[in-house]
């Protein structure tokens, strides 16, 4: 009683103040005494202690009805009312939490923001007399799979397991219609925690279980595993959230009805070569993914996990280790290709020989790869220059696919370069594709801003100091800009850019190559010449370039390399002669 008197004194209230008045005055007085507001810290501590004791006392208060000493006559025409003392349900929850602190795992008492907004299980608390009526109304209005009714210290607890997720506010507002005087409180139970909560409730002293229609032997359905989605995105190296969403939703269908799983094993034509192995493992998790509302957000988080993995590799691995790991992945793809159909091997060998016709100087390719690995400052860019349709982009795209990196367009206005350059974050190399500038005489080429923009990116080209790169919705990253290749038609090459280039490679028209490529339409349609497997195989079959590849890597894939050389040697003379005549190799 003394603590209550002191509390009302601090709150400037009479001793007879109601619980609602005390709570309202507490919020107002707390602002007055709060240290951050210039108040008294000691009084604030005292006020919080007294208020906590008051809440505990309110939670222990029992329901009472007070009878009038001089009741009205039975037929006086006036209605009679009971003075009902309503216990503070938050206090009851506080006492319940105090008895069993581990129940905080299953639902939140004070911080409703931490609750799931649409759980499928709810905990209701009301009076024992109101419970039967309220339960009947709930069964009429909601689809209910099961329930549990328990009595504890004068109140009734109802655990509802609904057929579909329902907002906490929806259940609470429905119950309030029938609980105008009786206490009523609704709490959402976290997903897949209903059985654990019930077991915890049964251990509370003084709790009596009245009804139970929930099967306690049924194991909770497995929850969607975010980690599986993230690992899958990293596995397929997907940095497009919408593409990942579409791919993962298709894994939800049964494997026996999946068109991809029914296809013959052809890793060249199938975009996701690991689909047959991934589908059974992810099918259940993907079916749960279909019922999640924020699918795009989860896929964006998975894409962030892919970018984070790249950032980790960039920070912890040397460039030589990164390229060696990439070669290992491409060699596995070559092994699967050589184990495939003969028709696919024929096209693969044709692509290798066509690449040899387009760019026979393998030493330049080796020098480019070594420069990409060493990444020396100043002179670390290669310029591919030549007329239109001479194979500049084909060779550059093959190198980019083998090393991995980003293709950048710098022909726009300078204000558009900021986020374009941000695509180079954590990349191994970059390709400045089809850079425009001032046309050379008699070329009839359009002019552009590309050369001017590159000239203004001297720190990026030199790689001597870190530069700030930025992606949308991400913080700036300071890093050494990656090395790369510049492709251009016959534009005037500024001296300042040429001074920062390692080599200028000139391309010319090769009529026989163009004719052979047109006649071998299957190679053209599958874009096999720009595939990383084609370029690496080209390096492996040339003796002068094979020795530049790591010896331990060649020893690890010795059988694959020998099989590759056998397939090429078996077809070389026939295919090479027909290609140099501009004919299709299959005729």
From Swiss-Prot:
Phosphorylated on both serine and threonine residues. Small t antigen inhibits the dephosphorylation by the AC form of PP2A. DNA helicase activity requires Mg(2+). Residues 6-82 form the J domain. GO terms for cellular component: host cell nucleus. Keywords: ATP-binding, DNA replication, DNA-binding, Early protein, G1/S host cell cycle checkpoint dysregulation by virus, Helicase, Host nucleus, Host-virus interaction, Hydrolase, Inhibition of host innate immune response by virus, Inhibition of host interferon signaling pathway by virus, Inhibition of host JAK1 by virus, Interferon antiviral system evasion, Isomerase, Magnesium, Metal-binding, Modulation of host cell cycle by virus, Nucleotide-binding, Phosphoprotein, Viral immunoevasion, Zinc, Zinc-finger. The keyword Secreted does not apply. It comes from the Viruses. Its main location: host cell. The keyword Isomerase applies. Residues 65-75 have a biased composition (Acidic residues). Its cofactor is Mg(2+). InterPro entries: DnaJ_domain, Helicase_SF3_DNA-vir, J_dom_sf, Lg_T_Ag_Polyomavir_C, P-loop_NTPase, T_Ag_DNA-bd, Znf_lg_T-Ag_D1-typ, Znf_lg_T-Ag_D1_dom_sf. It holds the Pfam family Polyoma_lg_T_C. Residues 360-520 form the SF3 helicase domain. It is found in: Host nucleus. It catalyses: Couples ATP hydrolysis with the unwinding of duplex DNA by translocating in the 3'-5' direction; ATP + H2O = ADP + phosphate + H(+). GO terms for molecular function: ATP binding; ATP hydrolysis activity; DNA replication origin binding; helicase activity; zinc ion binding. Zn(2+) binds at residues 258, 261, 275, 279. Residues 58-78 are annotated as: Disordered. ATP binds at residues 386-393. GO terms for biological process: DNA replication; symbiont-mediated perturbation of host cell cycle G1/S transition checkpoint; symbiont-mediated suppression of host innate immune response; symbiont-mediated suppression of host JAK-STAT cascade via inhibition of JAK1 activity; symbiont-mediated suppression of host type I interferon-mediated signaling pathway. A zinc finger (T-ag D1-type) spans 221-319. Isoform large T antigen is a key early protein essential for both driving viral replication and inducing cellular transformation. Plays a role in viral genome replication by driving entry of quiescent cells into the cell cycle and by autoregulating the synthesis of viral early mRNA. Displays highly oncogenic activities by corrupting the host cellular checkpoint mechanisms that guard cell division and the transcription, replication, and repair of DNA. Participates in the modulation of cellular gene expression preceeding viral DNA replication. The J domain is essential for multiple viral activities, including virion assembly, viral DNA replication, transformation and transcriptional activation. The LXCXE motif specifically binds to host pRB, RBL1, and RBL2. Forms homohexamers in the presence of ATP. Interacts with host HDAC1. Interacts (via LXCXE domain) with host RB1; the interaction induces the aberrant dissociation of RB1-E2F1 complex thereby disrupting RB1's activity. Interacts (via LXCXE domain) with host pRB-related proteins RBL1 and RBL2. Interacts (via C-terminus) with host TOP1 and POLA1 allowing DNA replication. Interacts with host TP53, inhibiting TP53 binding to DNA. Interacts with host preinitiation complex components TBP, TFIIA and TFIID to regulate transcription initiation. This is Large T antigen. It comes from Budgerigar fledgling disease virus.
